[in-house]
Amino acid sequence: MAVLGTVDRQLQSGDSELAGQFQGILVSVDPDRDSLETLGAYATAFSPRFLGVTGSREDLVELTTQVNVAFAKVPLAEALTQEAPSPEALADAYTVDHTGNIVIINPRGHYHGFIKLPHDPETIRLTFQTLASQF
């Protein structure tokens, strides 16, 4: 999100019409931990125009499959090494691994592609400008 915030600021300082078309959206793949309020606060810390969203596990699987993003809930090793961990401890002892791609959705709302790591603000800005000029 930080790199998207940088791109947003670059666009805001340049072409205001183009800047108005740029939208950053953080999609959390951990709805058990990430509330909409938390996501909204996190996303707007990078730009007041950014959104934070999530959904049910089924909806997230459908979305991530469509946009070539992988994610998996991974148990933390320290919880598994406890002699008799409680069910609560096991339920909360995980991380979520996920692809670090930036997904590009075109102005018509269709999946356009993605940008792999490492994320360079200038590459993202140029990609966005090129895409915006086609619509």
Residue locations for each model-derived region?
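Generic intrinsically disordered, low-complexity segments enriched for polar/acidic and small residues
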Residues: 19, 39, 43, 68, ...
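Thiol-/selenol-based redox modules, centered on thioredoxin-like
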Residues: 77-135
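Structural microenvironment flanking redox-active thiols in thiol-disulfide oxidoreductases
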Residues: 1-63
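Short, internal strand/loop/helix patches
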Residues: 25, 40-99
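Short, charged low-complexity intrinsically disordered segments located at boundaries
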Residues: 34-37, 69-75, 104-107
